[in-house]
Amino acid sequence: MRDGIKVRLVNYTKKPLETVTWAALISYWDEWETEAFERLGEKDVEMHLPRILGYGHESILEHAVLTFAIEGCSRVCSHQLVRHRIASYTQQSMRYIKINPRDVEETFVIPESVKKNPELYEKWKKLMRETIQLYEETYKAGVHQEDARFILPQAVRTKIVVTMNLRELKHFLGLRACERAQWEIRDVAWKMLGEIAKNEELRPIIRWAKLGPRCVQLGYCPEGELMPPGCWKRTREKWKEVALG
């Protein structure tokens, strides 16, 4: 896992944009026309969805959900992720999955800021090797794995499946794709956006719902004096590259 965090879009609502559009149009119909869903085409979506979202009626986005598989992030990152409570999560269990005593960077996330200091970097790796060794000694001594895991640091890599509706995903990206977000969760956010951008069926919603950091959604940076120098330009350019290709 030396190549960093992997994010993959594994599933999503069938005909997601048609589903969202149909749900929106229900508000205006006198009759419950479920058959109308099958009649909705690309032109209908393009005619209605951008206009309805432009009015701020974003609750309709909740009718489409996306499921992502995230691999290789630390538990520091996953703890931030699960704070977004309008979502579903299933995480790799440290009670049943033993840590494999391989290269420490296959097992733990080490920040780049630490790697820039060679002496400190070696101390980190030494401590992590010792941690793995003691972890193994603990469960080999008969201590249950659910107790042996207590020694593991938050740097340990994990896997997690995340399911969010489009409205919550917009909220998540607004906060976590921001340059002020912690670097690891920010990486996850941009990779999630990249997965949507690669999907022809989903790609239009990026533009219509303004999926991305809050500066993209709002047209200005809401961080005020906390905005990092040059952030506005960097973020907009990155969004165009990732989201629009």
Swiss-Prot record:
EC number: 2.1.1.148
One Gene Ontology term from the biological process aspect of the record: dTMP biosynthetic process
Cofactor comment text: Binds 4 FAD per tetramer. Each FAD binding site is formed by three monomers.
PROSITE patterns xref list: THYX
Amino-acid positions noted as binding dUMP in the UniProt annotation, renumbered to this chain: 80-83, 91-95, 149, 176
Reaction catalysed by this enzyme: dUMP + (6R)-5,10-methylene-5,6,7,8-tetrahydrofolate + NADPH + H(+) = dTMP + (6S)-5,6,7,8-tetrahydrofolate + NADP(+)
Molecular function via GO: flavin adenine dinucleotide binding; NADPH binding; thymidylate synthase (FAD) activity; thymidylate synthase activity
Necessary cofactors: FAD
Protein known as: Flavin-dependent thymidylate synthase
Protein's gene: thyX
